[in-house]
Amino acid sequence: MQNKITIEECQKLLEQNPFGSLLQMKITEAELGRVKAELPFKKEFTNIYGDLHGGVLYSAVDTICGIAAGTYGYYVTTVDGQIRYLKAARATEYVTCTAKVVKPGRNLTVVAFEITDANGML
């Protein structure tokens, strides 16, 4: 990819990822080193309590972080990840996952992320 990143390019990357496409996310913003996407709240993504399952949230941010890192033109794969669940993602239309590259690199890229609900909380 070039320095000019489009939503369409990032959406195409997302849809080419067989696992990532299962999440049915929609890229809403994209620029070099930063991607924002909406993850729909679907019954199939919930845990026994009706909240979004933590594994689904982790998978969503892992996928979006990979796309954000990939905007620099490198093939990427996750080597390490950490997430802290501060609040349950309760029934809402969608949650927003925002990934921002903190330190780009050819061999290792560091990406931070944030998850919010439709009200900007979580």
Which role does the model predict for each range below?
Residues M1-L122:
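Terminal targeting signals and extreme-terminal segments of soluble enzymes
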